[in-house]
């Protein structure tokens, strides 16, 4: 943040990861109009190590989502593959339930709704905070599921993906 303050933040600037975001930092993010691209899958994948190795008073500040969104900070998700699992559904589920791989809760106040978690992956590469649309002239990027969204909300998992289409071309099909 100090580098952005010194150099001057510009539209589109963002911080990747934002692993630890204490309340005072949220104010600075808003002041500089910086967005965050974070990886909630690390709560699931590495959360038990965080609980063990990071001071308890910092646990509420790890991979925050809900607090940032409520404050008005733009937030998008990534997986940080290959350092994190490449499956975006792991990240979405972790943002919703905030459970570690062993089932411990970490930052439960940072939970978000399933549809909000999905939207955090729907931005464009150049502008991850603006949702892409399905309309004439836009790239045909689609993910077809094997059950209705209302049912998927209770079981966020890549096992429900039937087909993935990028730029109108099938790049994955379960059939």
Descriptions of predicted regions:
Residues 157-159:
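Short, small/polar residue-rich loop motifs at catalytic or cofactor-binding pockets
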Residues 1-13, 18, 23-147, 164-165:
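His/Asp/Glu-enriched, well-ordered alpha-helical/loop segment
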Residues 174-175:
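Short linear motifs in exposed loops
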Residues 149-155:
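Short, Lys/Arg- and Gly-enriched loop/turn segments at beta-strand edges
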């Amino acid at each position: 943040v100090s580098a952005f303050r010194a150099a001057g933040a510009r539209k589109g600037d963002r911080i990747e990861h934002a692993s630890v975001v204490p309340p005072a930092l949220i104010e600075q993010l808003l002041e500089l109009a910086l967005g965050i691209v974070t990886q909630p899958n690390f709560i699931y994948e590495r959360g038990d190590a965080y609980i063990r190795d990071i001071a308890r008073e910092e646990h509420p500040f790890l991979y925050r989502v809900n607090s940032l969104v409520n404050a008005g900070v733009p937030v998008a998700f990534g997986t940080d593959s290959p350092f994190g699992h490449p499956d975006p559904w792991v990240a979405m589920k972790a943002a919703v339930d905030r459970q570690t791989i062993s089932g411990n809760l970490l930052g439960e106040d940072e939970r978000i709704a399933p549809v909000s978690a999905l939207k955090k992956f729907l931005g464009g590469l150049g502008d991850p905070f603006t949702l892409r649309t399905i309309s004439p002239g836009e790239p045909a990027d689609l993910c077809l599921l094997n059950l209705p969204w209302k049912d998927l909300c209770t079981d966020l998992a890549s096992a429900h993906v039937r087909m993935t289409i990028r730029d109108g071309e099938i790049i994955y099909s379960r059939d």
